[in-house]
């Protein structure tokens, strides 16, 4: 989990390519829930909330970059101490971002143990929600491909998958069957084998993502032009605030991966301004996707791609496009699931080491004792015994929990909008807002008191006033309260 990699040796790319990676990271499958949220909450409230949420997300992203520069200065000073390098003095150059320091490692550098554990737990719960969304979206898409196409608000999970099928095979039964198939047959072997995304899969998913979103915007626009608006969402509906806010946070989530994308950039000139431009482009993209969908379809599905699979166009070309859009979440999320699962396992192991450090030390002592007692064993016997000793309860329990809990949530509900709103509203708020605020506050203090040098203007977030941290914290707190009130059924 903790790895600082020199960008000069791990591969670099131009700033333009890096910004494109940031764009691709932000525009993920969370965008598929936005059109439904727009239609539920109203177009004016949605535009206002999404704009404000995007701005707050951008402020938090600049905090992560500033903390990253301080982390690089800390590592630079550590290297000078280790190698007794007195030639290079402390200065602005030590804050240059040349080493990749993950958010988890920055938390270990700057935060207290309580804040560190909070950060890890927030990331863990967020990743749990992420996996639950994945293991809901893929099976629901597969179920809609297999079952009769219904594009209406009257469809129920208890409806039969096909009229000619046995009554027991309802849409929910088929969905749950696909949940088990997806997790046990497809994803579990990849997680056990430790398969991660290759370059070719990354290129394929990026191209399919761009093609899918462009097709959805184009088809919805064409439908509006030819048939007019099928729905007339209100300007605002505060009862839809909860789902909208959660989806807005989820749709702009990128902070946990910023170090991996920013560090390899060959030049980081005006990086804050250019990332602001990326956020602006993403915002326009989201508005176009969501507004066209909210008005073009009478009933927007919680997985937006399903609206096109269920439309009235039956020509050969449209059928190919519809099946591609229906398969799009299956392709992209299946390739990402093992990465999220392995990241979650790593975070669990780190928290275990933080909370129970003595367990590892005791195991080491036992291994040393065993080696003294059984020095006469053969190499094969010693190797087999060590492998058995190294396998603890956690090694079996953690992967089981990682897959079992999100799968259980997916078996309970197929409401992807609900899962996205809860994941974005609670753990998502911590990952996107709370952790960056904690990091930048501690990093600035560390730069002044330990490094004895302020963060250079080039690496400074444009939002230096403590008021911004208070504002983000207040916004996050207010929003979580609103979401909670909506979830318990309070009317506004």
Curated annotation (Swiss-Prot):
Keywords: Glycoprotein, Membrane, Transmembrane, Transmembrane helix. Glycans are attached at residues 151, 313. Residues 39-44, 135-176, 231-237, 296-324, 414-415, 488-492 are extracellular. Residues 1-17, 66-113, 198-209, 259-274, 346-392, 437-466 are cytoplasmic. It holds the Pfam family Aa_trans. It is found in: Membrane. InterPro entries: AA_transpt_TM. PANTHER family: TRANSMEMBRANE PROTEIN 104, TRANSMEMBRANE PROTEIN 104-RELATED. This is Transmembrane protein 104 homolog. It comes from Caenorhabditis elegans.
């Amino acid at each position: 989990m903790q790895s600082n990699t020199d960008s000069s040796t791990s591969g670099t790319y131009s700033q333009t390519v890096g910004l494109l990676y940031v764009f691709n990271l932000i525009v993920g499958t969370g965008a598929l829930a936005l059109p439904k949220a727009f239609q539920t909450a109203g177009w004016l409230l949605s535009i206002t909330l999404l704009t404000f949420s995007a701005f707050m997300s951008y402020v938090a992203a600049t905090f992560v970059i500033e903390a990253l520069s301080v982390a690089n200065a800390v590592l630079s000073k550590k290297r000078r101490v280790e190698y007794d390098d007195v030639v290079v003095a402390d200065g602005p150059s030590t804050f240059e971002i040349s080493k990749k320091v993950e958010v988890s490692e920055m938390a270990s550098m700057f935060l207290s143990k309580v804040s560190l554990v909070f950060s890890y737990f927030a990331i863990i719960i967020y990743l749990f929600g992420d996996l639950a969304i994945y293991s809901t979206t893929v099976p629901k898409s597969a179920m809609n491909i297999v079952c009769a196409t219904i594009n209406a608000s009257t469809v129920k999970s208890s409806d039969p998958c096909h009229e000619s099928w046995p009554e027991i095979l309802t849409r929910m039964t088929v969905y749950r069957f696909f949940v088990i198939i997806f997790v046990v047959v497809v994803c579990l072997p990849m997680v056990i084998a430790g398969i991660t995304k290759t370059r070719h899969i990354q290129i394929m998913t990026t191209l399919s993502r761009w093609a899918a979103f462009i097709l959805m915007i184009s088809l919805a626009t064409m439908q509006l032009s030819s048939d007019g608006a099928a729905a007339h969402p209100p300007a605002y509906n505060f009862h839809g605030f909860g789902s909208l806010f959660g989806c807005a946070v989820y749709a702009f989530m990128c902070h946990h991966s910023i170090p991996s994308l920013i560090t390899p950039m060959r030049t980081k000139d005006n990086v804050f301004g250019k990332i602001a431009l990326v956020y602006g482009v993403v915002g326009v993209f989201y508005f176009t996707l969501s507004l066209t969908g909210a008005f073009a379809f009478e009933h927007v599905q919680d997985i937006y791609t399903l609206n096109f699979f269920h439309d009235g166009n039956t020509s050969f070309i449209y059928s190919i496009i519809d099946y591609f859009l229906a398969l799009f979440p299956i392709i992209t999320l299946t390739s990402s699931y093992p990465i999220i699962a392995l990241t979650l396992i790593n975070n669990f192991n780190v928290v275990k080491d933080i909370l129970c450090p003595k367990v590892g030390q005791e195991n080491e002592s036992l291994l040393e004792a065993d080696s003294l007692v059984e020095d006469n064993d053969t190499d094969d016997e010693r190797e087999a015994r060590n492998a058995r000793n190294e396998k603890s309860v956690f090694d079996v329990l953690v992967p089981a929990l990682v897959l079992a809990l999100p799968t259980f949530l997916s078996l309970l509900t197929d409401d992807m909008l609900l899962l996205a709103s809860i994941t974005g509203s609670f753990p998502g708020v911590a990952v996107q807002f709370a952790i960056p605020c904690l990091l930048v506050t501690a990093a600035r203090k560390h730069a002044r008191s330990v490094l004895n040098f302020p963060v250079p203007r080039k690496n400074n977030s444009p939002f230096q006033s403590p008021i911004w941290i208070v504002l983000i914290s207040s916004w996050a707190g207010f929003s979580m309260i609103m979401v909670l009130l909506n979830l318990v059924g309070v009317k506004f």
